[in-house]
């Protein structure tokens, strides 16, 4: 088989199963409104949960820092790319979340890959929730460690897998809030089982940090537990981009030596780090609390109004509200019907979600108003198929 045939066959297979992804060009897409092809839509696909991507205080912080530092970091943090802005943000994050250290990464994908590839060795075992993010599962598959996956949020299955003899170390992997189902993991119970078997726990709280818990400290804080490794990302609740790993002093020093995604990547711009510090200040403030409360009220309004007899509404009380419709074509047609009526919604299909669970992934944000939720419900219940 030639290279071209391999490429063509893969694309043909995606088209045949209605799983071919496409990108849309938008002129505005993070906030309440999405604008594409000159038309304005109510936006129910954004991860900007607290509406901070448009916050004037955060925008101003980035602009001022860009004037001071320039628009790029100039290199890896191990060479010349670790500025006072990076250092300040790491210290603020560590203090906020109660860890000795925080290390910044350019993305959540990079952070997850870096931690797993740096830590896991031959004879080790990774025990991950089946619905863990692609960045975690890909890193686990590429590592020399054995990967076992437990049934989603099934702590009994997790316990059985950990009981199996392992000559090396074991790492349990879970998420605070799952990106496609919107539900939370029973983290306190998972941690108890993990420690019983002398393993470590990694929690990716990309969709919980900033949005849940006191001062937005996230899902782990809300459940009263602290994993050995906490990954937080900044493209959702923070409204910016990037990520950080929270850990012990010794693990931070280890990652600085052996995490290749950190050592060999240009660090985020100092202006981005300063904008993230400004975002953190808003998240921790009374304004941040008000934004979280408004978002929670909007989620309740949506769940109370949706017609559960027509859609499978998952047990999600986060900003992520998936409506499982099953069939790929049905999901695509529903998304298109909603767009025709002014609501921008994403149809999520395999391989992002398991076969037979295609869905509309609705995301609500603080930028929405109650009337927007009512309009979404009206359009959902009236959408033709």
From Swiss-Prot:
Q: Which pathway is this protein engaged in? A: Cofactor biosynthesis; biotin biosynthesis
InterPro entries tied to this protein: Aminotrans_II_pyridoxalP_BS (IPR001917), Aminotransferase_I/II_large (IPR004839), AON_synthase_class-II (IPR050087), AONS_Archaea/Proteobacteria (IPR004723), AONS_Proteobacteria (IPR022834), PyrdxlP-dep_Trfase (IPR015424), PyrdxlP-dep_Trfase_major (IPR015421), PyrdxlP-dep_Trfase_small (IPR015422)
- Fetch the Pfam families from UniProt: Aminotran_1_2
Q: Which UniProt keywords apply?
A: Biotin biosynthesis, Pyridoxal phosphate, Transferase
| EC code | 2.3.1.47
Catalytic reactions on record? 6-carboxyhexanoyl-[ACP] + L-alanine + H(+) = (8S)-8-amino-7-oxononanoate + holo-[ACP] + CO2
Tell me which residues bind substrate. 21, 133, 352
- SUPFAM superfamilies, per the entry: PLP-dependent transferases
Binding residues annotated for pyridoxal 5'-phosphate, in chain numbering: 108-109, 179, 207, 233
Cofactor entry? pyridoxal 5'-phosphate
N6-(pyridoxal phosphate)lysine PTM positions: 236
Question: Family, per the entry?
Answer: Belongs to the class-II pyridoxal-phosphate-dependent aminotransferase family. BioF subfamily.
Q: What does the record note on quaternary structure?
A: Homodimer.
- Name it: 8-amino-7-oxononanoate synthase
Q: Which organism is it from?
A: Salmonella arizonae (strain ATCC BAA-731 / CDC346-86 / RSK2980)
